[in-house]
Amino acid sequence: MRIRRRLPIVLAVLLVAAAVALAVILRKHAPPEPARLLPAADGFVYVNLGWMRRANIAGELPAVPHDPDYEQFIQATGFQFERDLDEAALAIHYPANSPDAGLNSARQPRFSEVFVGKIDGERLRAYLRQLASSVDNFETREIYNIPLEGRTVRVAILGVDTVAASNLDDPLVIRGIIGRSRKLASPFGGPALLRQYYKEVPFASLGWAVFKVQPSPAAEPIGWSFLFSKPATVVASVRYLGAVHFKAQAITGGGDEASQLSDRIGNFLNVFSSAESTVSAPGPDPDIKALFDSLKIQPEKNRAVLTATVPPGLIRKVLAEAPLSVTPETAAPPVTPVPSQSGGKADKNKKKTQN
């Protein structure tokens, strides 16, 4: 009798344990939550900057000089991207496939983003209200409509650490992100392209990208027609295992396409490597040479698989030298609403001093 009484309890415990284990496994193979909140798109990019900082991939870097507009943003919100941003997920809408594509935007891609980090909500709301031409309310969330370069960027604070934005004309896009953020996170959720191909992303990847490739030069932001003769899907990822390991798979329609694509990519890399060795003086950078030496491209069934190992020293050099190439742009005429406001205040101060 005791065995019969205990049997249902044991079965119930086993069922609960199996359900929990299944949920954990599904969550491991599901895209990160910021990516699952994104709308349907032609490409997706995700970066886990929090893990990258903890892994100290780039090491100690010199101080980065800030653009005046960015410095104003930091002072107003207290948020510094290189310090406070933990996760970023980006959806890329190709021009031909954007729901709001028109004659004026035929060659311009559109983007939707979800950011996770250390956010001061009150300061960020105050900053967004200053920039917004209007504020909408949807499901208790405020949507800030910010005019920028002839378009409207819609921004919404989803939670204590999450912000979403989109520059698509359709207001339903940002509302869809808000609606998904208020539902219980499901490992089965997310855009169809991610649900289909995220399983190809290696486990513990710090960053990855999944995007469609069309041979037409006007189909996406980057023209791939010199490599791809037919449509394909690319899955790229980055992992850190003492060094940065990069892997990109171009999933094609068959084995012949994969072989031809591998040959074209291999020839392109050989030409690029030869050109780099020729222009480098007095000799090629050892980190760049190590990168090119590690490059491998080979067909695997219906895929062309490219792998490479990026030395940490090369990453440090790129990040350390990047500010030098952007600092001259700080003198360019401001085009965003932020500098126009600061410029207006400066003009008023000048008039006061003259009086």
PLM feature segments, named:
Residues 56, 60-85, 134-243, 257-258, ...:
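An internal, short helix-loop-strand segment that often contains or flanks glycine-aspartate motifs
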Residues 231-239, 245-295, 299-304, 308:
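Extracytoplasmic/luminal low-complexity segments enriched in Pro/Gly and acidic/polar residues
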Residues 34-38, 46-50, 54:
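N-terminal, charge-rich interaction modules
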Residues 24-42:
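Ser/Thr/Pro/Gly-rich low-complexity linker/stalk segments immediately outside membranes or between
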Residues 1-16:
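N-terminal Sec-pathway targeting helices
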Residues 45, 81-189, 248, 306-326:
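Single conserved position on a long alpha-helix in the C-terminal lobe of the eukaryotic protein kinase
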